Curated annotation (Swiss-Prot):
The lineage of its organism: Bacteria, Pseudomonadati, Pseudomonadota, Gammaproteobacteria, Pasteurellales. ATP binds at S123, S124, G125, L126, S127, S128, S129. It is an enzyme of class 2 (transferase). Catalyzes the transfer of the gamma-phosphate of ATP to D-galactose to form alpha-D-galactose-1-phosphate (Gal-1-P). This is Galactokinase. GO terms for biological process: galactose metabolic process. Substrate binds at E34, H35, T36, D37, Y222. The keyword Membrane does not apply. It comes from Haemophilus influenzae (strain PittGG). Belongs to the GHMP kinase family. GalK subfamily. It catalyses: alpha-D-galactose + ATP = alpha-D-galactose 1-phosphate + ADP + H(+). GO terms for cellular component: cytosol.
Amino acid sequence: MTPIQNAQQIFNRQHKNLPEITVYAPGRVNIIGEHTDYNDGFVMPCAINFGTAVSGTKRDDHIWNVYAADLDETDEFSLNVEIPKSEHKWANYVRGVVKFIQERYPDFQQGANLVISGNVPLSSGLSSSAALEVAVGKFCQQLGDLPLSHTDIALNGQKAENQFVGANCGNMDQLISALGQENHLLMIDCRSLETTPTPVPQDVAVIIVNSNVPHDLVTGEYNTRRQQCEEAAKFFDVKALRDVSVEQFQKREAELTALSPLAAKRARHVVTENQRVLDAVEALKNNDLTCLGKLMEASHDSMRDDFEITVPQIDYLVELVQLVIGKSGGARMTGGGFGGCIVALAPHDKVDAVRKIIADNYEKTTGLKETFYVCTASQGVRVI
């Protein structure tokens, strides 16, 4: 059963009527451009065919009653008083989104009964949190007939995650969940918010393999990496590392390394990764999978050696995939790091061989069982 069907059926069962509003927002996978978004840089994700559905109906008071079907937990809060934090982590994503929409539209106090259901694997690096934030934001927009664009909804979700949940994420995850296009990757300029759709070549599959090494960005090293990048930007006297070219970095690399070796390594990753995204757009335009594969490999090496966010299980998965696909595609870690998933672009006729080499070796070597997905690039948030 899809998240949409599940949310609607459970709502009907609980409330004895059909929901007036159902919205759906997808998760995402980032093909290239990691930890560049909060440095005002470039990313190239696509929305995927896994996501989060929210079904609900207006109430005649100010109360939100929210049931998270997949967790079997309920949260309730009022919109006519200051919205406090919940002890349920998932509920804070919902509360944060509503709180910041209220800041923008103080008259928005419409109560609602909601059911949430999703199939984005939690803590996998595929943006279950952004899908939830964007779905709830779109639900609010429909509920209150608010003049919010999909970009507004995305940035409101980011604000909720930064300021209410406490994860200092960039804006990529929410933007792609809101703005994704079917069968396209979306190159996003995280400063101007300009998007450039790039078709996924027809003969290419988007493969995601979850290492099932759990990660938690709120308590992890994510915020430390962000501080190190800000330190490097200050050294170059720029607003963000986006403003430093590869040549400019190389000229002063030794100087920064002497001052702060870690900041230099982090900056080297971000500066070179931004260039790799721009090069990847050109490679895709030319249908040059060999070039794209090299860029993805260089991205992974940079995350492993300079940004230091991969783990041995992830590195091993990438090695296995590269053995099979050779020069006909690429593989790299995707997401915030410290576990989560790898992404690979490979010809459809290599998918079974990729699946087999991982099934034969990964669990035997690591003691963990992978989860294997073949995804399609999908449309962003929508009303059902």
